[in-house]
């Protein structure tokens, strides 16, 4: 086989493996977010948004209970080989989450919002973080 033929074959394999990893990571993220959302529901929260996006960032899960609006960042890993998932929440990520939360609050308060706000208003906004390693969930409330 020619050298260029082998190079093309390697490029195709690399593209396929990249696409396969992307699908696996997407499925892992959805599984983790489903697990976290179910945890909040069991704890008596209403989920009012999932994967809410704006130019300032994305909010994985937004929940509500007893006057507290909770924004949860979800991190998922297949295993712990690459460290603690919570370490992936950098100061820059926290800033993006805070800015996205401000945009979310502004949108929920607008008349054109597609999000149904909870009855009453929140007195507090809390930021939680969730890590799912394999199938194990670890929650940290009020982390930043």
Label the predicted regions.
Residues 50-51, 64:
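Charged, terminal alpha-helix-loop-beta segments
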Residues 52-55, 119-121:
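A short beta-turn/loop motif at secondary-structure boundaries
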Residues 55-57, 134-135:
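Short acidic/glycine-enriched loop/turn segments that link adjacent beta-strands
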């Amino acid at each position: 086989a020619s050298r260029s033929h082998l190079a093309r074959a390697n490029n195709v394999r690399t593209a396929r493996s990249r696409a396969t990893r992307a699908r696996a990571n997407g499925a892992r993220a959805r599984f983790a977010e489903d697990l976290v959302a179910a945890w909040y529901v069991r704890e008596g929260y209403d989920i009012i948004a999932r994967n809410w996006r704006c130019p300032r960032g994305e909010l994985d899960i937004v929940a509500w209970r007893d006057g507290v609006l909770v924004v949860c960042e979800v991190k998922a890993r297949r295993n712990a080989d690459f460290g603690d998932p919570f370490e992936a929440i950098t100061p820059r990520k926290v800033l993006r989450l805070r800015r996205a939360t401000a945009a979310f609050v502004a949108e929920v308060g607008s008349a054109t919002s597609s999000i149904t706000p909870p009855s009453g208003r929140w007195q507090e906004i809390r930021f939680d973080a969730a890590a799912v390693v394999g199938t194990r969930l670890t929650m940290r409330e009020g982390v930043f």
